Amino acid sequence: MWRPLENTPEVLEPYLQKIGVQDASVFDLFSLEEIPEYIPRPVHALLFVFPSSGTKTIYKGSRILPKDSDKVLWYPQTIPNACGTIGLLHAVSNGELRRKVNENDFIKSLIRTAEGSSIEERAKLIEDSKELEALHAAFAGPPLEVEGSEEDVETDLHFICFVKGKSKDDNHFYELDGRQEGPVQHSEIESDLLNAEVLSVIKNYIQSIDSPFFSLVAITTP
């Protein structure tokens, strides 16, 4: 079991830079009502954290694609508490960020291998990657513990990634969650990910889950 990541710029920005997106910047989004002017555009991905014990319904008008859809590169999550790293993998494997990963970084090699692999092979690729495990551990928080137990526990908070597809010509945005049945394709958008349509999907999830424990960050590059 891995230790969970925090959904904060202080954790995710250096992590992204370490895995090969040298000019990545990460910003907190504290409100869904107004799009902050201080966030540089374009925004290439959003990472949303919510309580996984809640009931998350598929947004009206969206559809679940096959796990091995060629529109996006989707990774299954099989390691407890690995959702933060899976979310980052989804971000850098799709949309504009996939074209910004350093060619010499091991993540670029992992992405290439994953694209030619079955879903089961992708899961094993992540499970067997000592480099990825070490990177996650370097940026993870302290172990979660239950009083009276020495065992680590699985967090209830879960990361999902909103990002565009692999092709520059694909204007749909996608919801990528390694615990679900596959990638979710949403509507086409004309702008970047910091968009009213995308925020509407996130608002829908917040309203459907009775909990204050949510966080949202935007990933940008110059």
From Swiss-Prot:
What is the organism of origin for this protein? Schizosaccharomyces pombe (strain 972 / ATCC 24843) (Fission yeast)
Q: Report the active site residues.
A: C83 (nucleophile), H158 (proton donor)
Site (Important for enzyme activity) at D177
Residue ranges of coiled coil? none
| Listed EC numbers | 3.4.19.12
As for what it does, the entry says: Ubiquitin-protein hydrolase is involved both in the processing of ubiquitin precursors and of ubiquitinated proteins. This enzyme is a thiol protease that recognizes and hydrolyzes a peptide bond at the C-terminal glycine of ubiquitin.
Q: What are its GO cellular component terms? A: cytoplasm; cytosol; nucleus; proteasome complex
Asked whether the UniProt record includes GTP-binding among its keywords, one would answer no
Q: What is this protein called?
A: Probable ubiquitin carboxyl-terminal hydrolase 1
Task: Name the Gene3D superfamilies for this protein.
Answer: Peptidase C12, ubiquitin carboxyl-terminal hydrolase (3.40.532.10)
Q: Which domain of life is it from?
A: Eukaryota
Q: Which residues form the UCH catalytic domain?
A: 1-221
Instruction: Give the reactions, separated by semicolons, that this protein catalyses.
Output: Thiol-dependent hydrolysis of ester, thioester, amide, peptide and isopeptide bonds formed by the C-terminal Gly of ubiquitin (a 76-residue protein attached to proteins as an intracellular targeting signal)
